[in-house]
Regions:
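Active-site neighborhoods and metal-handling regions in enzymes and metal-associated proteins
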Residues: 1-289
Length: 289
């Protein structure tokens, strides 16, 4: 995956090129495309045409940050920057950039409004680059997918073990808190070779309705018989290049789930299934969604 894939995608979609813009680290896509880390203090534009070699437009001050300067246009002031852009983009009508119309996808909306004005002022039609980036840099390799699936299997087993342990304690009338269950689950995940950026969430009853809830040793509800319990856990294999898995499950600490609880669970489950079916149908049809 890389620039050749990006150019192939651009040609297939009839887009003239991809303009990656960054100002002092505002767009992480640039570092991914160029590779490595650089200390850049001025505006940088990396033009990837559908056909031909890419061109870098950067300040002369930052010239030393780039080892390969063969395709570089250095500018010294704003007017020369605009001139360089105008020259580099000559002949292009449709330009993909990191922006999302209406702010619909903020993760890939990295270009400020003024820069969009600048490119449009050069007579270009700006279109979103999200699909370009995903196709060229965000598809999983077979090895990466294997790490994701292995992590998912470990998480699934850890989840089952935690529910069984917690409900056994609760039904027997023995005291166990959200935090204690969380710590047991986190240790099991680590013992199975997973790494994570935050400990899993174990939330009972109304706490399960707070998306940002996390139990602490000081503030943690006791899990009792007939309680509703949510477990949200994520992790990846503790090795380079591994990919996260993330699951959320709910359970009921009783012999029979109340009708209202089941009704809510069924609604969420059916919504999940409908979303997956929509994505599968779109993928089979080669349709973006």
């Amino acid at each position: 995956m890389g620039l050749k894939d990006a150019q192939e995608f651009l040609r297939r979609k009839g887009i003239d090129g991809w303009l990656v813009y960054d100002f002092k680290g505002s767009n992480p896509v640039l570092q991914r495309v160029l590779g490595g880390e650089r200390f850049l203090t001025r505006r940088v534009y990396y033009w990837v045409p559908a056909e031909g070699a890419p061109t870098l437009v950067a300040s002369a001050i930052d010239r030393g940050q780039f080892k390969d300067q063969s395709g570089m246009r250095a500018y010294t002031h704003r007017a020369s920057m605009v001139d360089a852009l105008s020259d580099v983009l000559r002949g292009a009508r449709t330009v993909a950039m990191e922006y999302a119309p209406g702010g619909t996808l903020p993760y890939v909306s990295r270009v400020d409004g003024g820069t969009l004005d600048l490119i449009r002022g050069l007579g270009k039609t700006v279109v979103p680059s999200a699909d370009v980036y995903q196709y060229a840099y965000a598809r999983l390799t077979d090895a990466e997918l294997a790490t994701h699936r292995q992590a998912a299997r470990i998480l699934d087993a850890a989840k089952d073990w935690t529910f069984a342990h917690v409900f056994s304690e609760a039904l027997a009338g023995r005291r166990i808190t959200e935090w204690e269950a969380q710590q047991l689950l986190a240790k099991r995940m680590r013992d199975e070779g997973l790494a994570y950026d935050h400990e899993p969430i174990v939330a009972a009853n109304q706490n399960a309705g707070d998306p940002h809830y996390a139990p602490t040793q000081r503030e943690s509800a006791v899990i009792r018989k007939d309680d509703w319990l949510l477990i949200d856990l994520w992790g990846k294999l503790a090795q380079p290049g591994s990919v996260y898995a993330d699951i959320t499950w709910t359970g009921y600490a009783g012999r029979s789930v109340p009708a209202r609880h089941r009704q809510v669970f069924d609604a969420v489950r059916d919504g999940r299934d409908a979303g997956v079916q929509h994505l599968e149908a779109a993928a089979k049809a080669g349709r973006a969604t």
